[in-house]
Amino acid sequence: MKIKLLSTLICLLLSISLSAYDGRHGWPTQKAPQKIIICNNQNLSHAESMLLESLSGLCGQAVNDGTFDEMVWIEFTNTSYHKILKSSLKSLNISKPTRMNVWELLDYLKRKKIVKGYILYKADVSKGENYSRRQGINYSSNVATVYAGLLQGILVEESLENRIKATGLRKLKDARNESPEDCFTHCKDQLNRHSALSIDPKVSNCRDIAIAQKLMLYYDTGRFSEQILEWVTPLSPILGWNCGNEAEYTGAITRWGHYNTASNWCQNLPVIMAASDKMIPLPVHEKSIDEINLKDSSAFHSFVISDGDNMQWTMGEFLDSPVYYGNKDKNQSPVSWTLCPVNLSVVSTSTWNRFVSMKKDNSSVIEYGGGYQYPDEFAKNRPNREELLTEFARRMNWHFKKLNIKIFGFICKDVFSEEARQAYEIYAREIEGLTGMIAIQYNPYNMGGDMLWVKNKKNVEIPVVTAKFSIWSGLFHNPLCGGPDYVAALINRDAAKAIKEKEKYNPLSWTIIHAWSDFSKTATSIDQPIKGYKASKTSDDLLSPLVKNVSMNELLWRIRARHNTKHNVSYFVK
């Protein structure tokens, strides 16, 4: 009985603590600098890139501590990041950033007493690609990164030690023989419990934010990663990426009540976050029901691009790639985009605002999960799953109202499970103004267009609609999945069948397009490569006159109107 009362009390106290939401979706705060130092990473060795990341991280930490007023932008060749830098400098009111190379920067920060010494590590040279599961991985760069944040030391690989010693810096820690498990045991009480970084020891990206925010690092799945995810405060962003089965490591993150940010190739997060706090996120425009001709009883279809919960992609090339949102099509085909509006609006506001300014009225934006997570597994390892689901949904509501997001989408392990339905009911109840929700099955993506209905706070039914078809290369076992031309034929077939058999209603359905699938060798189009937006465009061009391609928001309104034929428009918007 005492245990039960104690559990109830803990849940009550957590509920009170969660109620004061700060609008950051778990992301830490990075204070703003007065000056920016730009350091180019071209032609640097891997060891120098790691060194540079640590210098940037120490500056971010010092600014947070109020002992310094300068931060570092690591310059590299990327159009989108160049635009983010320009916007960030404007937001921070910095007109003339300073330029230094990595060794000038080290000397400068040493003189400013930002660097107290160095942490020694050994580079991982295990055979295999980045973010692969490899034999004999050396984890000392990850251990060193943890100590760099705690001891204010730079990351120094063995090959650079003599050069660093010559500067007069002392060795603060030799991380070469300490395991990640021992590091966690020694350091966890000093670390930030509101996030963690999953990162390949080979990779330098994101070590700046890990050092600035004093985060724990891990890599691979298993008991140790589970230990860290349990330790991290629920409802936190887990940075980076991992190796092995995507469903396995994202599932682990989800079951402990967190979300995967898919941010492993992000750059300069400390500076971008600091600048974003001085920007106002723009609301996006979506069609309202009174802008839609509901008397038109044609067959309607929507195409949706997947993987928008991938932060590193949306920040890195999404807006400028002609294959995706940077397409130059003058007569843009209606296509809707899964995206991470909540995370972008907090972390990279300039990226989000660019998207809003570029958005066409015939498209929709779908918040994809509030981060990569599986609603049916969310917080299953915690004793208060329902409470955490509710608080997560309330966060979504706060951001959805601010950004005018109308559609919540997500991937589930089992779309129609009791646990999934519980999540949908909480989402519908807590997120105001939803037009509807779209659900993807992890495998297969499409579930034949089946749907279910859940009620919002006003007792209005909200649909959760699965994709009828998927455009995904190489999945030959799925009869409702194929290339753009094959799926267009299926859509046309359904519309023709409805007329031929005098069905009561014409089809209202949608297709999920796998963002990375390339159909250049199998589909017919002169506009290459056929992937992303161009896959949608190819399929749209092949639709019969019986089918009208519309945004997902319009499709959801039509589904709701058909489901509630006895009600007028005021019923849906009350």
Located regions from the model:
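Bacterial N-terminal signal peptides that target proteins for export
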Residues: 1-7
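Bacterial N-terminal signal peptides
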Residues: 7-17
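Preference for solvent-exposed, low-hydrophobicity sequence contexts
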Residues: 21-276
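Short loop/turn segments at strand-loop or loop-helix junctions that form parts
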Residues: 122, 298-308, 339-340, 366-374, ...
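Short, aromatic/basic amphipathic alpha-helical patches
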Residues: 128-150, 247-261, 351-355, 422-427, ...
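Catalytic grooves of carbohydrate-active enzymes
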Residues: 222, 226-241, 306-332, 342, ...
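Active-site beta->alpha N-cap acidic-glycine motif
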Residues: 269-354
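Substrate-binding cleft of extracellular glycoside hydrolase catalytic domains
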Residues: 340-405
